[in-house]
Amino acid sequence: MNGIHSENGYTEIIKGIRIKTLCYGESMLMAEFLLRKDAVLPEHSHPNEQTGYLIKGKIRLFIEDAVRELVPGDSWNIATDAIHRAEILEDSVAIEVFSPVREDYLKFINDPDVVK
């Protein structure tokens, strides 16, 4: 398994970005992200549609040619295969849902006994 496990169930996947997979089903997966100020999520894309909700903090999200500064209560949608990246402007917490399931995030499930 890749990443650094912490006692609270989060795994650092990129410097300053920690994930905990909360639950998943047949066609979607939900994860919580702890994002440190000044962390950068590099430009990437994936075949999963992605929606998110910012609980705490402030981030700058780049999706294709659009740029948005997000604050608590804001949400977003990233289409399948859309190129995106993010800059973390304040310590932040976000919840994101991926469809179909991101198979690479199943290893970050907090409780191995979670039932689909």
Descriptions of predicted regions:
Residues 1-27, 109-116:
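A short, N-terminal "cap"/entry segment at the start of jelly-roll beta-barrel domains
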Residues 31-45:
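Conserved short histidine dyad/triad with adjacent acidic residue
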Residues 48-59, 64:
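Glycine- and acidic-residue-biased ligand/ion/polar-headgroup-sensing regions
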Residues 55-56, 71-72, 90:
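A cytosolic small-molecule/anion-sensing beta-strand core signal
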Residues 65-80:
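Short acidic-glycine-tyrosine-enriched beta hairpin
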